[in-house]
Structure formats: structure tokens, C-alpha cells
From Swiss-Prot:
GO BP annotations, alphabetical order: sodium ion transport
Membrane topology: Multi-pass membrane protein
This protein's record includes keyword NAD: yes
Annotated protein name in UniProt: Na(+)-translocating NADH-quinone reductase subunit D
Length: 210
């Protein structure tokens, strides 16, 4: 049984110290696609966190019964089943959002973070630790997504969660929204800035020069 210190390291390590996007550069595609609004970023973050946590838990539970030759197929089957559940729940409670995010929710099946944690950690670790690892990596993913979504919606539209925060010029206010931030490439710049700030304070994450 893992001790409390190890559990905390597994749970909180991926948030900043070993962030899946900032350090491992995984899950970039969805970070570009769904962060034009904070609402979409939040829903995607919750969906990926739940799928990563529970898929890692279930895969770890049966890891000793999975033949090595078909382990990837088994992992993807479990992940796909959980993604279908998430998509159906989203359609039941927020159909408009589900319709908008349907393609990206479906792509969680092949998300590098989910597949990576299943193969690299869940196949070698007990269920509880695998579940915590999934939660931790989901939180690390969420931190970046929510940061990008916050900046893009606030300065690109002058709103948060669809509610006007900054008075726009077209509505008689003073702020001229930055249209560039609504475009997907802006997420690249913001993620790059996030990585730069993180590595400024965490020198151990800077790659060694050849």
C-alpha cells in the first residue's frame, strides 16, 4: 500500500512539476480546438479527467489478465466505452454543448494523455494509484486548458462563460476585442507563454543544451 507522500506526489506532481502539456507536450490538439471559451475548456477538462482516471483504474484492475499482444486493443476498448458514457451524459444534460464538442469528446479515445497513462502507469501499478495518477494528469491538463480558455475568451470576446465582463466598443464600452485570440493559432502562443513562465520558475524543466 502506497503511503500518503507517494499518493500526493502522484496526484499533484502532474499539475506543474510534470505537466502533461507543458512538459510532455501531450494533448495539444484539443487545447487548440476547445479553448475559445472557458465553458468548453471546463467541460473538456472534466471529461478528460474522468476518462483518464476511470480508464486507468479499470485497466489496472485487470492488468494481469490482459495478454500483452492485445493490450492496446483492450485499453482502447475501455477508454472508448467511457468516452461514450461521457458523451451520452453530456447530450442528456447539455445537448447544445455536446453538439459543439462532439468531435473533440470523441477524440479523447486517442488522446495521448489517456493512452499514455494507461500504457505507462496503469499497466504497472495498483488500481488506487492508477486512479490518482489519472486524476493528477487530468488536473494538469485542466490547468493549461482553463488558463488558455480564460485568456482567449476574456481578451478575445470580453466575456467569461458567455457573460460580458469587459464593456466592448460595439456596445458603447471602451475595449476593442483582440480577434486574433479567437483563432486556434492563438492557443499555441498562450501555451508557449505558459511553458516559458513555468520553466522560468522551474529551471529543472529546461532542456539541457547539446
Amino acid at each position: 500500500m502506497a503511503d500518503t507522500k507517494e499518493m500526493k506526489a502522484v496526484l499533484f506532481g502532474p499539475v506543474l512539476a510534470n505537466n502533461p502539456i507543458a512538459l510532455q507536450v501531450l494533448g495539444i490538439c484539443s487545447a487548440l480546438a476547445v479553448t475559445s471559451s472557458l465553458k468548453n475548456a471546463l467541460i473538456m477538462s472534466i471529461a478528460l479527467t474522468l476518462v483518464t482516471a476511470f480508464s486507468s483504474f479499470f485497466i489496472s484492475t485487470i492488468r494481469n489478465q490482459i495478454p500483452s499482444s492485445v493490450r492496446i486493443i483492450v485499453q482502447m476498448t475501455i477508454i472508448a466505452s467511457l468516452v461514450i458514457v461521457v458523451d451520452q451524459v453530456l447530450q442528456a444534460f447539455s445537448y447544445a454543448t455536446a453538439k459543439e464538442l462532439s468531435v473533440f469528446i470523441g477524440l479523447i479515445i486517442t488522446n495521448c494523455i489517456v493512452m499514455g497513462r494507461a500504457e505507462a502507469y496503469a499497466m504497472k501499478s495498483p488500481p488506487l494509484m492508477s486512479f490518482l495518477d489519472g486524476i493528477g494528469n487530468g488536473l494538469g491538463y485542466s490547468v493549461v486548458l482553463l488558463t488558455v480558455g480564460f485568456i482567449r475568451e476574456l481578451f478575445g470576446k470580453g466575456s467569461l462563460f458567455g457573460v460580458d465582463i469587459i464593456p466592448l466598443v460595439q456596445n458603447g464600452g471602451w475595449y476593442q476585442p483582440m480577434g486574433l485570440l479567437i483563432l486556434p493559432p492563438s492557443a499555441f502562443f498562450i501555451i508557449g507563454l505558459f511553458i516559458w513562465v513555468l520553466r522560468t520558475y522551474k529551471k529543472d524543466q529546461v532542456e539541457a543544451k547539446a
